[in-house]
Amino acid sequence: MLNEFPIFDYEDIQLIPNKCVIKSRAEADTSVTLGNHTFKLPVVPANMQTILDENVAEQLAKGGYFYIMHRFDEAGRIPFIKRMHDQGLIASISVGVKDYEYDFVSQLKADAPEYITIDIAHGHADSVISMIQHIKKELPDTFVIAGNVGTPEAVRELENAGADATKVGIGPGKVCITKVKTGFGTGGWQLAALRWCAKAARKPIIADGGIRTHGDIAKSIRFGASMIMIGSLFAGHIESPGKTIEVDGEQFKEYYGSASQYQKGAYKNVEGKRILLPAKGHLQDTLTEMEQDLQSAISYAGGRQVADLKHVDYVIVKNSIWNGDASH
């Protein structure tokens, strides 16, 4: 039972250092393999309209990073796969579970994407299990990511249905208000939920939501994630698709959730909100900084590669990471 586990979130955990075995953090290898491909970082920008469009997806793929294209331009998905494959890049798309998506998946046989993410808010569902089975039947070589879920039972069921990876996180994101609207979710205990789910998993887990600092990437790996999906830290860049808005002479970019009225265009079943983020620099600068910070984390872990973070000790100190830092 869950109640036997300590409940904590990212800000409650500090990892404990080990003796460093590398001369420079630059020696630390941040690459990870998911399916048949290896990527520079165990990080993937959230498949949301204000985080990436086709151009950002292409930039990420060319740079050796994993990406998942969102599913909100349905008609553009097949041309997008062709655009990526024509350049020798991997194609990674999202699908929902509505009836017409079954025909869409069957149409992909001629030019199958390397990755498909089944992307719905409550992924522990018969509809998701049925879609996993359909994709695996039609496109046996495509790597299927299914989510989102928040329990070990869900992870096991989706894996048993054929999912190659599961995405864990129900509403912990900065622009997600599922926990407020419904009373359900992993907000406030996302890291403990990740740990709980990872203990049951036999295949990779993607932690999704609640990442606020680069140190949270290392913590996610410690508690069982193979890949970490990040929204707000990737929003608001020069390349980001969100609208740029000027307020009192300062530039902001809009960032909204995938079930918000801004994305749906209608105020129904809303579980997302819109916020404005101060406009940042280039996306590549953030990716480089994440890589350097993760290299430092690996060196503190006494390791040489990402997997070495899985073995460090940790301490639970409630809400401790901003202690002594009055600016927060």
Curated annotation (Swiss-Prot):
Keywords: NADP, Oxidoreductase. GO terms for cellular component: cytosol; GMP reductase complex. The keyword Nucleotidyltransferase does not apply. GO terms for biological process: purine nucleotide metabolic process. InterPro entries: Aldolase_TIM, GMP_reductase, GuaC_type_2, IMP_DH/GMP_Rdtase_CS, IMP_DH_GMPRt. Gene3D superfamilies: Aldolase class I (3.20.20.70). One of its GO terms (molecular function) is GMP reductase activity. Disulfide bonds: none annotated. It holds the Pfam family IMPDH. NADP(+) binds at residues 205-228. The active site is at C176. Belongs to the IMPDH/GMPR family. GuaC type 2 subfamily. This is GMP reductase.
